[in-house]
Design a protein with these regions (language model features):
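Amphipathic, Lys/Arg-enriched alpha-helical "gate/interface" segment within cytosolic domains
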Residues: 1-123
């Protein structure tokens, strides 16, 4: 499942992946929130937390993630991904060259640092 996280500025979309993340989670929760935010802001930041209760993500959910990312490719300002899942960290580093915004992966023990970074002013 995907849960929307509170306590972030309006230009930061923040979610946590818990348990098994599915395509339905993206279609019913994440994508509508992203579209609503882009209706109000030209550029957004994205914070995604995949902690100890994250069990995995199905292939269809990954496809939805890729589609929403590419649909708004030039409008993403910054990404923070918090995870200790090595394959996710590696996948992000492989695809980071495609993304125009800054991308950082943080370990779960550094979640506070990730939250500070995602809201910090751009240089």
């Amino acid at each position: 499942m995907i849960a929307k996280l509170q306590g972030f500025p309006e230009n930061v979309i923040a979610f946590a992946g818990r348990g098994q993340v599915t395509k339905d989670d993206y279609v019913s929760t994440l994508i509508p929130a992203v579209e609503r935010a882009f209706a109000s802001y030209d550029r957004l930041r994205f914070y995604y937390e995949l902690g100890g209760d994250f069990a995995g993500i199905d292939v269809d959910a990954m496809a939805e993630d890729f589609k929403i990312g590419m649909q708004h490719l030039t409008r993403w300002e910054r990404f923070a991904v918090v995870t200790d899942v090595k394959w996710i960290a590696h996948a992000i580093s492989l695809f980071s060259f495609v993304m125009p915004g800054a991308i950082k992966v943080f370990s779960t023990k550094d979640a506070d640092q990730a939250r500070s970074w995602i809201v910090s002013p751009s240089l």
